[in-house]
Each structure stands twice: as C-alpha cells, then as structure tokens.
Amino acid sequence: MLVDFSQASLWLTLACITFNPTAWNVAARREHHTRWLTNLCGGAKQGCYAIAIAIFSMGIIRDALYNQALNDQPTLSLLDNALVRLVAGLLFISGMIFVATSTYALGITGTFLGDYFGILMSERVTGFPFNVLENPMYVGSTMSFL
C-alpha cells in the first residue's frame, strides 16, 4: 500500500493544509472590507505583522503535522537510496532559497498580505528570484515539500 489512509496524522495534516490558507484569506478579506485588524492592532502595519505572525505560526504547525504524517506512512524501498536522498536534498535547498529570497525581496508586508491592509509596494519586484520564476514562493514551497 502506498498510502495508509487509516492514519489520523494524514487526515489532520490535510485538514491543516486546507484550513490555514482559508483562515488567513477570510481574515484578510474581512480586514480589507472592515479594517477590523487594523483597528484592533492600532495601525495597518501592526495588523499586517499580526497576521504575518499568525500565518508563520500556522505554517510551523502545518510543517510539524506534515512531518509526522510522512513518518506514519509506509516507505517505498525503491526510493530508499542515496541518489533519491541527494535529489530530495537539492530540491529542498533550492526551494528554500526561492522562498527565503522571495520573502527578503518582498519584505514582511509584501509577503504577508500587506495589500489587504492598504500597504502597497512602490514598484514591482523584478530582481532575483522573480527574474527566474514568476511565482518563486509557490514553486519553492512545492520543491521543499517534495
């Protein structure tokens, strides 16, 4: 069996993967229409930093659950070799470079939904990694999770 669907960790991880972006997008859209988080936190930048902390924290929980779910799943002996581990390591490192450099280029408010708070960048970011990939955060995250 390739996937053990009886593992609770699998279902909890899938729920978390689904819930997290839904929650922060609902919160951000509500912020855009009502400024509830701006008012609660005393300013747009503070509200954006608050949602950034929530998103980052939820991501850490998701990653821990994902790791546990993987550990609870059966392994495929075909993939248990040095070449696969090397490729996996290179994908992870490359993916993290794309994610980290994207975050650096965009800053906290550019990365974590600042536009919903009315915080806009003065110009489009075109340097690395955006000159290599159109969506380096999505591609980098996918590479890291493979």
What are these model-derived regions, one by one?
Residues 1-132, 139-146:
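Membrane-anchoring alpha-helices and their flanking helix-loop junctions
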